[in-house]
From Swiss-Prot:
Active-site residues, as the UniProt record annotates them: 241
Organism, scientific name: Geobacillus stearothermophilus
Residues annotated to bind ssDNA: 381-382, 384
Mutation effect (residue 217 to A): Loss of helicase and ATPase activity, still interacts with DnaG, complete loss of ssDNA-binding. No longer forms a complex with DNA clamp loader subunit tau
InterPro entries, alphabetized: DNA_heli_DnaB-like_N_sf, DNA_helicase_DnaB, DNA_helicase_DnaB-like_C, DNA_helicase_DnaB-like_N, DNA_helicase_N/primase_C, P-loop_NTPase
Residues bound to ATP: 213, 215-218, 250, 362, 418-420
Gene label: dnaB
Catalytic activity from the UniProt record: Couples ATP hydrolysis with the unwinding of duplex DNA at the replication fork by translocating in the 5'-3' direction. This creates two antiparallel DNA single strands (ssDNA). The leading ssDNA polymer is the template for DNA polymerase III holoenzyme which synthesizes a continuous strand; ATP + H2O = ADP + phosphate + H(+)
Example of a GO cellular component annotation carried by this entry: primosome complex
Protein name, per record: Replicative DNA helicase DnaB
Length: 454
């Protein structure tokens, strides 16, 4: 495969590279826009890489960038003769009549650099296809990651000096101090929950676990709706259990306060039709993207979310539910190890895309054997490393689910059993089952909201 490209000259524009360097010699201020677009490795000719690097070092010391200082810098690093000597630097200084077009020239250099990296990446992918014996999904995931890195021009990965991090951290603290409210992450729309968590933080993995039919899907959908309709964030929902149409039916009920049974059967009153029209209008303007592929792999989730973030932006990911995600096949032991691998991958995804990932989880039947049915960490099915990977573990508990005579009808407890960077505790919400909707508890006493028998 490499022979295909061995006799071809890689994409490059020596003239544009010379124009960039010449513009900096002509006007040192041109280094600012040039350095915002280019790094030394973007230059094709090795001599140009060294010259641009020398310019950056001189500028970093606060010295003027000109023919004299750059010559001295290259001489000090014993690179002056390697780049062609003072005579070549003088040629560069006379290469352009004006520095006004430096950004245009830099874009040409950048474009050629991206093409070269793309060729190298494609060659590497093709070579892997011939020689690697990994699972096809592993190869596809790696290929997608490599291509995305090229398209995003990632120059990250180096060490970060703590002084730079401290400056960014101080600016962030100052911003938080000056903003209204206590929310530092993405608001869920539930007052007490947001107060306890400060909103769901970017890069966090949030596990929401409950027994079947307690309301975890409705809870996650409510959060997704609140985020998508009340903020500018887009939400990606992966539904492995229900179809996209079933999810949207639930969303319409919650958004329009429409009885779910009436909507399922089509027996809508004139008032319901009005509510449905308003709910459809609200949701159609929301940035909600649904994928209902069953038995999807984490690699597929990652690839689709990377693409969505690049094309439209992404603020949150919801997965219903974790145990239905298909393993990579690399774990030869048992399903628990596969689920552990999946949870680690979801945490890595949250960090990579800098969005909160909400993953729903089933609970084992062991919770049914206890006097107190409130869930515990050990109740998470095939838990493995889920507890370790998660930044927040939230259990949903309804007393009236187990006790039909409960005094706390329609009340659901959101038990924050783990919060890596915050307190643990319990938040109560009202659950309007007919609407598939959770509301803040202070609104529960507006009886008009809650149908009889909810």
């Amino acid at each position: 495969m490499s022979e295909l490209f061995s006799e071809r000259i890689p994409p490059q524009s020596i003239e544009a590279e010379q124009a960039v360097l010449g513009a900096v010699f002509l006007d040192p201020a041109a280094l600012v826009p040039a350095s915002e677009i280019l790094i030394p490795e973007d230059f094709y000719r090795a001599a140009h890489q060294k010259i641009f690097h020398a310019m950056l070092r001189v500028a970093d010391r606060g010295e003027p960038v000109d023919l004299v200082t750059v010559t001295a810098e290259l001489a000090a690093s014993e690179q002056l003769e390697e780049i062609g000597g003072v005579s070549y630097l003088s040629e560069l200084a006379d290469a352009v009549p004006t520095a006004a077009n430096v950004e245009y020239y830099a874009r040409i250099v950048e474009e050629k650099s991206v093409l070269r990296r793309l060729i190298r990446t494609a060659t590497s992918i093709a070579q892997d296809g011939y020689t690697r014996e990994d699972e096809i999904d592993v190869l596809l995931d790696e290929a997608d990651r490599k291509i995305m890195e090229v398209s995003q021009r990632k120059h990250s990965g180096a060490f970060k000096n703590i002084k730079d991090i401290l400056v960014q951290t101080y600016d962030n603290i100052e911003m938080l101090h000056n903003r209204d409210g206590e929310i530092t992450g993405i608001p869920t729309g539930f007052t007490e929950l947001d107060r306890m968590t400060s909103g769901f933080q970017r890069s966090d993995l949030i596990i929401v676990a409950a027994r079947p039919s307690v309301g975890k899907t409705a809870f996650a959908l409510n959060i997704a709706q609140n985020v998508a309709t009340k903020t500018n964030e887009n939400v990606a929902i992966f539904s492995l259990e229900m179809s996209a149409q079933q999810l949207v039916m639930r969303m319409l009920c919650a958004e329009g306060n429409i009885n779910a049974q009436n909507l399922r059967t089509g027996k809508l009153t004139p008032e319901d039709w009005g509510k449905l029209t308003m709910a459809m209008g609200s949701l159609s303007n929301a940035g909600i993207y649904i994928d209902d592929t069953p038995s999807i792999r984490v690699s597929d989730i990652r690839a689709k979310c990377r693409r969505l973030k690049q094309e439209s932006g992404l603020g949150m990911i919801v997965i219903d539910y974790l145990q239905l995600i298909q393993g990579s096949g690399r774990s030869k032991e048992n399903r628990q190890q596969e689920v552990s691998e999946i949870s680690r991958s979801l945490k890595a995804l949250a960090r990579e895309l800098e969005v909160p990932v909400i993953a729903l989880s089933q609970l084992s039947r062991s919770v049914e054997q206890r006097q107190d049915k409130r869930p515990m960490m050990s109740d998470i099915r095939e838990s493995g490393s889920i507890e370790q990977d998660a930044d927040i573990v939230a259990f949903l508990y309804r007393d009236d689910y187990y006790n039909k005579d409960s005094e706390n009808k329609n009340i659901i407890e959101i038990i924050i059993a783990k919060q890596r960077n915050g307190p643990v505790g319990t938040v109560q919400l009202a659950f309007i089952k007919e609407y598939n909707k959770f509301v803040n508890l202070e609104r529960r006493f507006d009886e008009a909201q809650i149908p009889p028998g909810a």
